[in-house]
Amino acid sequence: MQASDLNTPISQNPAFLKRMKQRSRADQRFRYYGLLAIFIALALLVTLLVSITFEARSAFTRHEVSLDLQLTDTDSRSVYRSIRGAIQNMAGDPADRDVRIEMSQLVSRLAAGEITEALQTSGVDLSAAYPVRVPVSDEADRYLKGLATPVHRFDGRGFDQEGSRIESDFSGAMEIFHRWHREQISTIRHREYEPALRMRDGLARQAEAAPGDRQLAMRLAGAEHRVELIEARLSDFEARINAERLVLDEFTPSVLFRSGEGWMKAVSISGGMIEAEPVISGLDPDRQRGEILVIEQPESQRSIPDAQIVVLERFQTAGRISSHFNGALFGNADSSDAEFAGVLSGLVGSIMIILVTMGLAVPVGIAAAVYLEEFAPRNRWTSFVQVNINNLAAIPSIVFGLLGAAIFVNGVIIPIPFVDGVFRLGGGLGRGWPLVGGIVLALMTLPTIIIASRAALGAVPGSVRQAALAMGATRLQTVNHHVLPMASPGILTGSIIGLAQAIGETAPLLLIGMVAFVAEMPQGATDRATALPVLIFQWSTRAERAWEPMTSAAIIILLLVMLVLNGLAVLMRLRYEK
């Protein structure tokens, strides 16, 4: 070090200034890292919420068809028969039995139940037409919302029809067909043809190495035959692209042509003409109302057939179909049909479970925390209890479900030695009871409440206790009158956060039998019930595509419930801190 550096003040020393700049840059980088972490967390949260909301948007509305029923009786069977008759009558009363069956599937049998209840409540004159709005089936609802299959519409006015031949501009439909065939060729090449070639070449190399292996030769012959079949399919698709006229079947996109209120289905198509057959007969053709529908997904690959699409389009043209808020989502219990399913039974079950959990875990947890923090002697036994409470908070929730199923539902049978008898420990409670679910979740939440309450009690200054004791208060009075009021914001926050965690649990409830299908509202804590997280799990495993937005909607409702609980914790903390 030079002598000049020793005589320089520390604030002007170059080495010191260099280190200060480095420390300042490190501090600034750390702040940027913190802001980046917060931004990433918020971005992930927003992405999750937006994706769930986007998926659930279609679940909050449903389409209903307006019908005029000619009732013969008010029982459910007669009402459903009248609904089917009204649909078939409005659709032209087709003679084809298969078409009539497909039309009857546009509404669920459960729709008759709601109408029957309304009829029995209000009464009706059976001699007059009874107007009703009936929810369409889940697949029909998805089609009307544009979720079932891509549908392309073209103007077909000014057409010329001669028998089964219709002349119009079908160039737009032909472009869709060519694009669809090219996509099919690309899919077959990547998913079938290239893997089949690799398998054939691999077997060929093995056959060259072992020319006498008959089993290998048979496998090679089968692989070569598979390649030939795929090549034939590819050649057929390529020929269709170059053909001027395409023959249509159930394995190709459908072309439906509306002339007035009559509908025709194309069996072959070219750029300027189609040959069609009637789907549902209607009024005479009207050249001013022609419309071409190209349904991109083949009929064999979708769950809504062409006949149902024709009926829905005809009802829409007549103004019989309208979209309404899906009140069943909030007012109905679970159902096997998505259009009538709701979260009310799961929400009521969750409320019952959380009330039982709160009644057991909160007072016991706060009392245990007060004793351990204020009255318990500091010895090995107390330390052992505290360590095990911390360990219980880290146990997976499914273990508490196993404990609840073994102790509260099934019971533990202990054989008594030297005596022909057994001792039964626990058991006797029913599977799927909210009471059992509340007890299990109370055991799971108890360590969290104890830890949070002890932390809140420990944060109270010791001078408060000393001042109260100096004024002559007992230890119990000190805790009740001074310590607990000051610690109550932290205690309430920890308790509500623990309850919010409990309301979102699924695994413990599955193990105690709350996974059953519950179509009625539970009336008490000892009735079979389900919970909102379990309902979400059940809906997510059902095969129909209509359950996907329903599941997302139920997730949003559960998130709102948890948001309300967490908001309540914040408000109570702010109130008691004042």
How would you describe each model-predicted region?
Residues 30, 34, 335, 340-356, ...:
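Alpha-helical membrane-interface segments at transmembrane helix boundaries
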Residues 340-357, 410-448:
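Loop-to-helix entry region at the N-terminal start of transmembrane alpha-helices
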Residues 357-389, 402-403, 410, 569-575:
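Transmembrane-helix boundary motif in ABC transporter permease subunits
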Residues 450-452, 461, 475-513:
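Transmembrane alpha-helices
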Residues 454-462, 469, 496, 500, ...:
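C-terminal transmembrane helix and the adjacent membrane-cytosol boundary/short C-terminal tail
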Residues 502-545:
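Glycine-rich helix-loop "coupling/hinge" segments at transmembrane-helix boundaries
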